Amino acid sequence: HYVMLDNIVGLGNCKYKYLINSAQLAWLKKDLALVDKSTPLIVSMHVPAYTYTGISDGKPMTKKRNTQYQDVQVLINILKPFKEAHILTGHDHRNRNIQITHNILEHNFASASAISWKLNDVRIMTTDGTLSGYQIFDISGKQIQWHYKAVGLTPEKSQFRAYDLNTVPEKYGGNPASNEILVNVFNWDPRWKISVTEDGQELPVEQLWEKDPLYMYIRDKTQRFNNRPKDWRAVNCIHMFHTKATEANSEIVVSVTDRFG
């Protein structure tokens, strides 16, 4: 069952606020009253319902978007009785998957146009380092699967980027002679598995709230932002993973596995 909501309220002069108004929520409640609770739901709207705020005690922290706090909670309460519900959102031009409840997952999508409406050789990724691309949903009956695909790449080559922090300049997050490894897993959600081995031995992996080194480098080098110095800065993201090898020249294998295996 598919639903489209409008949670942008125009205020004039290119200003707006985030709001799912009461009329839409009342309509949605009536609409879903006619839908079997075992039917998967896909609810789309522009602005995310939730966002990540960091990591505390090794666990990702989330919050509702401030200006639509109350109406988001009403929306969640309406969706809770269903076996499976997906909220599809955009707006921020970055990738986030947030497990709101055991049965409600928000997918906040990166953009095929990366960080702006123009796609060119310097705008190939978003502010969290996700390659410009789009989400593909495969739906068969009541079964839903999804994966991320970068523009111009196969799905297999669209999932992560790994950094040898020995070789990354310090101003972009590098750490010379540390043997540290940073992995950006673009479409991560809490049911993914991240594995890094050194010469066949598993290394401990830690989730970080961190910026993407390559995006910081690209933004620093391009001249296209000189007249807008605060726009599209690198942001901390939840899908960064860190480990440390024992040697600089050992064989490192990074493997990421989504919830579908």
What are the functions of these language-model segments?
Residues 1, 143-144, 252:
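Hydrophobic residues embedded in beta-strands of well-ordered beta-sheets
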Residues 3, 12-106, 179:
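His/acidic metal-ligating clusters that form di-metal
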Residues 7, 45-47, 148:
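A cross-domain feature marking catalytic cores of carbohydrate-active enzymes
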Residues 9-11, 112-113:
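Active-site/binding-pocket entry motifs
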Residues 13-15, 53, 116, 147, ...:
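Short acidic, gly/pro-rich beta-turn/loop elements at beta-sheet edges
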Residues 60-168, 202-204, 221-223:
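Conserved beta-sheet core of the metallophosphoesterase superfamily
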Residues 160-261:
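Long, low-complexity serine/threonine/glycine- and acidic-rich segments characteristic of extracellular
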